[in-house]
Amino acid sequence: MASDPLSLLKTLTGKTVLVRTQDGFEVEGKLASVDEYMNLSLSDSERTLEDGSKFKLGTLHLKGENLIFISLLSS
């Protein structure tokens, strides 16, 4: 089992996650990479809008200091 948050996050590489940023932006995608600052790269990412429609974003890079949470969506 991972002993620290960064190690745990790295075990999620290749899995589908939901990410929320400080400005309320929520996106789901496959975790492609994570670095020591918890900056993330997501592939096949998409955002679900308030009306339920999905908006494809493709590859997305998120800065670690702007993240509120990361949740596993698939195992």
Residue ranges and their predicted role:
Residues 1-75:
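Conserved RNA-binding domains used in RNP assembly and mRNA/RNA metabolism
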